[in-house]
């Protein structure tokens, strides 16, 4: 029952259309490149896409653009559910999982960056064009995610590199978008982190 309630909450869209196109484009970005991938690394099984689709629908995007944007979190699938698929793949090709994941991180990071223009096109098709200033900011967030994904494989166990890369950038993005307003809010944010 709890799983069904979580699924319903994820896909039942709130009415966020009144926020404006710029805010919706940022919501779409966060869903596709940060929250969706983070959720995918924690749970696997396409749950990142389920959560992303909930936000995408809440932004008023439907049909093919929603489906295409919703699939973007799957780029991080080698770390999905903490990476059992990568472990099996490494065993099959007789390569240490850390090495395979580190090599895959380069490919995933490049794919995230290369898919940005397609994402911007799909946002426009969905009624939320991304202006150049937003594109620059979004590219920096994706670059930070890609750099962390690659760099963390040198210092952390491969199973958590996707979670750490997406989680750190997601946290920074949310704090940047909604900074704490007072000392009490700062304490709550620090405790939550």
Question: What is each model feature region?
Answer:
Residues 1-14, 30-38, 189-193:
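Core transmembrane alpha-helical segments of multi-pass membrane transporters/permeases
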Residues 5, 9, 53-54, 87, ...:
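Transmembrane alpha-helix boundary and packing residues in multipass membrane permease domains
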Residues 10-22, 95-97, 128-130:
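Flexible loop linkers connecting adjacent transmembrane helices
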Residues 24-29, 134, 138, 162, ...:
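Residue-level signature of transmembrane alpha-helical entry/exit and packing/kink sites
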Residues 28-40, 143-153:
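Hydrophobic alpha-helical transmembrane segments and adjacent interfacial helices
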Residues 31-111, 128-129:
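Hydrophobic transmembrane alpha-helices that form the pore/transport pathway of multi-pass ion
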Residues 86-181:
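Juxtamembrane and boundary regions of transmembrane helices in multi-pass small-molecule transporters
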Residues 182-190:
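Membrane-interfacial entry segments at the cytosolic side of transmembrane helices
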């Amino acid at each position: 029952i709890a799983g069904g309630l979580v699924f319903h909450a994820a896909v039942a869209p709130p009415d966020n259309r009144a926020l404006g196109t710029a805010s919706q484009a940022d919501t779409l970005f966060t869903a596709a490149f940060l929250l969706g991938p983070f959720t995918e690394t924690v749970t696997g099984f396409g749950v990142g896409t389920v959560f992303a689709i909930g936000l995408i629908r809440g932004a008023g995007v439907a049909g093919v653009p929603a489906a295409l944007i919703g699939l973007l979190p799957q780029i991080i699938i080698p770390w999905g559910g903490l990476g059992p698929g990568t472990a099996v793949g490494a065993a099959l090709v007789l390569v240490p999982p850390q090495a395979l994941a580190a090599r895959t991180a380069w490919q995933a990071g490049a794919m995230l960056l290369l898919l940005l223009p397609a994402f911007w096109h799909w946002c426009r098709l969905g009624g939320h064009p991304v202006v150049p200033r937003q594109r620059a900011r979004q590219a920096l967030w994706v670059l930070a995610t890609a750099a962390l994904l690659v760099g963390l494989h040198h210092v952390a166990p491969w199973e958590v590199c996707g979670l750490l890369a997406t989680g750190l950038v997601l946290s920074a993005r949310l704090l940047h978008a909604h900074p704490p307003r007072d000392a009490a809010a700062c304490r709550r944010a620090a405790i939550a982190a």
